[in-house]
């Protein structure tokens, strides 16, 4: 009687299942993923970036930096629930700022809302425009939250421009709790992009744009900081 080999002996050894592309990229750093790098610009200055240069007419170190717009949620004095952030020019291309967390800034009970803390970082980074004498807006901002910030506490912020390449400004900031040397509560890296006045006149609400353009001081300042893309 002839023996027939079992069917399992004729089957090739099972190959490991191929890992789906999404799983293959899951452990890669975000900025190394092809689909991410196309959509989100890197926060790391490229090799040909250059050090930022403080403008000769920038505010002197220690000088208060005036609000760029009175209704700004970050620095505007007429914004009732704003941060009322106060900034001063530092040495080099650096600014320091501070704001006190009010009850209107709560997220969790008795704690600053995370979005408010991001706003404080963003506002301090935007204040670097005064030192560079340019108009730029946030293109990307990445924040690390390191500890809770209670209502009634003061956040001491420091922002600096790290590198420039064309219209791109690479910068970073941190916020310390209750003193300039206190524990770091939040930190950020950001990419700002230089723009012209058209950026605001094209996208802003007409009423506010009209009022801003009728303010001679604000209009003069905007024109002085304007750059060509």
Q: In which residue ranges do the predicted regions lie?
A:
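A generic structural signal for short beta-strands and their flanking turns/coil linkers
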Residues: 81-83, 93-97, 135-141, 153-155, ...
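Short beta-strand micro-motifs enriched in acidic
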Residues: 88-90, 160-164
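Catalytic strand-loop segment that frames the active site of acyl-thioester-processing enzymes
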Residues: 3, 66-112, 227-229
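Hydrophobic beta-strand-centered segment that forms part of the acyl-chain substrate-binding groove
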Residues: 4, 41-43, 123-157, 162
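Short amphipathic alpha-helical face segments that pack within enzyme cores
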Residues: 116-120
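A structural signal for short, well-ordered beta-strand segments
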Residues: 97, 141-145, 159, 173, ...
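HotDog/MaoC-like acyl-thioester-processing domains
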Residues: 1-11, 31-64, 150-151, 162-229
């Amino acid at each position: 009687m002839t023996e027939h080999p079992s069917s399992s002996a004729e089957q090739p050894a099972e190959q490991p299942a191929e890992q789906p592309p999404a799983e293959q990229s899951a452990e890669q750093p975000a900025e190394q993923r092809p689909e991410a790098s196309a959509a989100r610009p890197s926060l790391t200055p490229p090799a040909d970036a250059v050090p930022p240069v403080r403008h000769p007419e920038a505010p002197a170190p220690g000088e208060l930096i005036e609000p760029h717009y009175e209704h700004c949620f970050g620095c505007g004095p007429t914004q009732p629930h704003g941060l009322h952030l106060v900034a001063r020019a530092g040495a080099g291309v650096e600014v320091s700022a501070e704001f006190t967390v009010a009850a209107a800034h709560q997220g969790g009970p008795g704690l600053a809302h995370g979005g408010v803390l991001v706003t404080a970082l963003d506002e301090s980074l935007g204040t670097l425009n005064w030192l560079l004498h340019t108009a730029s807006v946030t293109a990307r901002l990445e924040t690390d939250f390191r500890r809770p910030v209670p209502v009634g506490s003061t956040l001491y912020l420091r922002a600096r421009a790290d590198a420039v390449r064309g219209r791109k400004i690479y910068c970073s900031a941190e916020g310390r709790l209750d003193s300039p040397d206190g524990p770091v509560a939040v930190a950020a890296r950001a990419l700002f992009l230089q723009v012209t006045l058209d950026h605001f006149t094209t996208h802003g609400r007409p009423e506010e744009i009209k009022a801003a353009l009728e303010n001679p001081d604000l209009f003069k300042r905007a024109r002085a900081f304007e750059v060509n893309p």
